[in-house]
C-alpha cells in the first residue's frame, strides 16, 4: 500500500515521498482502513516501509529493478522487529522465544549468544517452517595475526584447491538429496494439480531443497572460517561462477 501511495504521489505531483511520510501515511490513513494493522507490531511495519525505501533508492541511484509488491502467496515471507524495553527475549532453559505482540513460543534453540539484542527477524520458508534470527551487538574479537598467505583455485571435481595443495571436496551427501529431489519432482509431475497429494509432494520438495541449502551453507561457512583463521592474505580467481 505504501509503495502504491508513493507511486501515486509521484505520478500526480512529481513529488518524492520520504520514508517518514510513508510511515505517517500508514499510521494515519491505512490503520483506519485496515483495522488489523493495529494488531501488528509497529516496528515490523516501520522496518517494512524502510526496506521499501532502500529498494526505491536503489532503483534510482543504482539502476536496480523497481520495487515489487509483496504477496501473501510468496514462498518466502519475513519481518523484522526492533528490541526495546525487553520486548524480545530468549529463554534457553525453557527453550522459548518471546516476541512483540506474541506469547512466548517453543523453539529449537541452536546456540547461546552473548551481547545486547538489537533486533529479531522472523521468516517462513517454502517448507512451512518458521525461523527466528536474533541480531546482537557484541564486542569484536580480532583473529590472531599469521604470516601465512594462500591462493585459492576454484575446482570442478573439488570445491576449491589451495596453493599449498589442500583440496576441499564437494560434499557427496548432497548428491543423495539431489537424487531424491529429481525423484520427487518426477512424482509431482504425475499428481493432479491442487490435489492433497500434489501439495504433500510439493512440501517434500521444499524440505529437500531446504536440506540441501542448509548442508551447503554450513559446509561453506566451516571452510571459509578455516581459511580465514589460518591465513593473513587470501588471493582467489576473479571468475563469474554460476550456481
Predicted regions and their residues:
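Nucleic-acid substrate recognition interfaces
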Residues: 1-243
Amino acid at each position: 500500500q505504501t509503495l502504491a501511495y508513493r507511486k501515486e504521489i509521484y505520478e500526480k505531483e512529481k513529488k518524492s515521498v520520504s520514508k517518514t511520510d510513508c510511515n505517517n501515511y500508514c499510521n494515519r490513513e491505512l490503520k483506519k482502513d485496515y483495522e488489523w494493522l493495529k494488531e501488528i507490531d509497529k516496528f515490523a511495519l516501520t522496518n517494512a516501509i524502510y526496506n521499501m525505501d532502500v529498494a526505491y533508492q536503489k532503483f534510482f541511484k543504482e539502476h536496480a529493478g523497481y520495487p515489487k509488491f509483496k504477496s501473501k502467496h510468496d514462498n518466502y515471507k519475513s519481518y523484522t522487529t526492533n528490541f526495546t524495553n525487553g520486548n524480545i527475549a530468549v529463554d534457553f532453559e525453557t527453550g522459548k522465544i518471546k516476541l512483540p505482540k506474541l506469547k512466548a513460543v517453543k523453539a529449537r534453540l541452536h546456540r547461546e549468544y552473548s551481547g545486547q539484542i538489537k533486533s529479531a527477524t522472523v521468516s517462513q520458508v517454502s517448507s512451512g517452517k518458521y525461523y527466528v534470527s536474533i541480531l546482537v551487538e557484541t564486542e569484536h574479537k580480532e583473529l590472531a595475526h599469521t604470516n601465512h598467505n594462500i591462493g585459492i583455485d576454484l575446482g570442478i571435481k573439488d570445491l576449491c584447491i589451495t596453493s599449498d595443495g589442500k583440496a576441499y571436496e564437494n560434499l557427496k551427501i548432497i548428491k543423495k538429496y539431489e537424487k531424491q529431489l529429481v525423484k520427487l519432482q518426477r512424482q509431482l509431475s504425475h499428481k493432479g494439480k491442487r490435489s492433497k497429494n500434489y501439495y504433500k509432494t510439493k512440501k517434500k520438495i521444499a524440505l529437500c531443497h531446504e536440506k540441501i541449502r542448509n548442508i551447503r551453507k554450513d559446509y561453506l561457512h566451516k571452510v571459509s572460517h578455516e581459511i580465514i583463521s589460518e591465513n593473513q592474505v587470501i588471493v582467489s580467481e576473479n571468475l563469474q561462477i554460476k550456481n
